[in-house]
Amino acid sequence: MLEPSDYELTHKWHTDYDIQKMTCGQFRFVSKEIEKNWATAKSTNNLREIYLAICAIDNDRMIGYISINEIDHIHRSCHCGGVVVGDKEYRNTREYVEAVSLVHDYVFNHLNMNRISGGCLVEHIMSRAEMEGFFYDLEGIEKEAIFKDGRYHDKRNYALMSKTYFAHKSNGDYEVGKTILRIAKNVKQLKYNK
């Protein structure tokens, strides 16, 4: 889980425009005190949302975080609020794929969710490639849903159902190497079709 002491790193990432420009959230300047309160709140409430640190395989250093939000135990659904890999050295690497895979395992095998949703800006090719690489289905596009950088952006909405997850899991489709290759192929195709 994210720890209150992680606020120094999350503050650095939350105030880095290059990291935040492709997220669906608004870019905001925040003080370290506000960030400290945010990290404390995220690390002490795990009923409706869970924030997990992503750590490097080689040295166990925190390189980012991933969140599970809108956890609904009645409807058995939740939302992947996003993945932030703040350390540029580790972007689009094995750590990212393993973090998402662990979240899927936790969501479907431990929280007993039936679906996990996710969304991204239409122009965020990497997020699209990743969600499709993990077999999320496109459920629709919200027109001009996100206001960012002085203009409105369309948002793609995806979902991964438990039956889809377990079918691909039993086929071995979520092996890290296969997933990385699928994502790379998707990126290439999306850039070509752009």
Q: Which residue stretches match the model-derived regions?
A:
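Acyl-donor (CoA/ACP) binding surface of acyl/acetyltransferases
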Residues: M1-Y7, D58-K194
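Hydrophobic pocket/interface hotspot
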Residues: T10-H11, I19, E35, C80
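Conserved GNAT-fold acetyl-CoA-binding loop/helix
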Residues: D18-A39
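A short helix-loop-beta-strand connector motif used in the catalytic cores of GNAT acetyltransferases and
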Residues: T40-A53
